């Protein structure tokens, strides 16, 4: 019974994706909605992303240094490990999980509140495709999400450099040499491919849970929690699949 319910929800989700791109809202209206979503979802997230990235990058460098107890192991591996950790996993994946809480709860609660207050019903009565009106601007706004992850990568490595050098764990030259050593450009491509997929999940899964929720204010809170859980699970699952497909061979 539970399996049938889950499969039904997945089917409903894909039908929602199809409906989002039907009957487009006028560009003059859509343009304002897109800029509002960029402000709410991208600009407002930069502060927390920068803060977390900087300090986690520092922690990665310090923990790597503390585990290099053998004097024969070169110190430039601190920079190498920090770069690999930040670019491959921390910036694209774990920042996205954090954003599932920050962006996801905002999206679910805002759309859920509109459902509770019957604003979505009013849009439908006026002949507006409410899914296109509410969700499409979020998808377009989150096309800028790779820009946020790029900043996260830079600050993570910069935080690692500061912690490693000024913590006395390595020299600046060693860290930079390690950060440049055996660099594979495809790793950046891989990270941004993941980021684009995660951006789509961040825009649509919370929207789905907000749009189809039933009940009152209490249910809005519950829907936000469920949306966060399922967005996080989807991100981790797709992270595994994409890693296997893109790096497994």
Model-flagged regions — what are they?
Residues 52-55, 96, 136-167, 197, ...:
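Hydrophobic alpha-helical transmembrane segments that constitute the membrane-spanning cores
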């Amino acid at each position: 019974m539970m399996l049938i319910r889950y499969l039904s929800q997945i089917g409903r989700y894909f039908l929602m994706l199809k409906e989002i791109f039907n009957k487009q809202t006028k560009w003059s209206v859509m343009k304002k909605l897109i800029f509002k979503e960029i402000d709410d979802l991208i600009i407002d997230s930069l502060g927390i992303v920068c803060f977390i990235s900087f300090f986690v990058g520092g922690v990665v460098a310090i923990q790597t240094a503390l585990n290099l107890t053998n004097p024969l192991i070169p110190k430039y591996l601190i920079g190498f490990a920090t770069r690999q950790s930040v670019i491959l996993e921390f910036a694209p994946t774990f920042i996205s999980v954090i954003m599932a809480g920050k962006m996801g709860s905002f999206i679910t609660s805002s759309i859920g509140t509109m459902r509770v207050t019957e604003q979505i019903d009013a849009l439908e009565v006026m002949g507006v495709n409410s899914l296109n009106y509410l969700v499409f601007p979020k998808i377009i706004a989150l096309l800028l999400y790779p820009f946020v992850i790029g900043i996260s990568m830079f600050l993570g490595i910069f935080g690692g450099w500061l912690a490693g050098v000024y913590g006395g764990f390595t020299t600046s030259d060693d860290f930079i040499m390690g950060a440049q050593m055996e660099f594979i450009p495809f790793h950046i491509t891989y990270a941004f491919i993941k980021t684009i997929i995660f951006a789509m999940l961040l825009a649509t899964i919370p929207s789905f849970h907000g749009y189809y929720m039933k009940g009152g204010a209490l249910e809005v809170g519950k829907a936000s929690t469920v949306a966060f859980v399922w967005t996080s699970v989807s991100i981790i699952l797709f992270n595994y699949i994409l890693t296997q497909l893109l790096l497994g061979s």
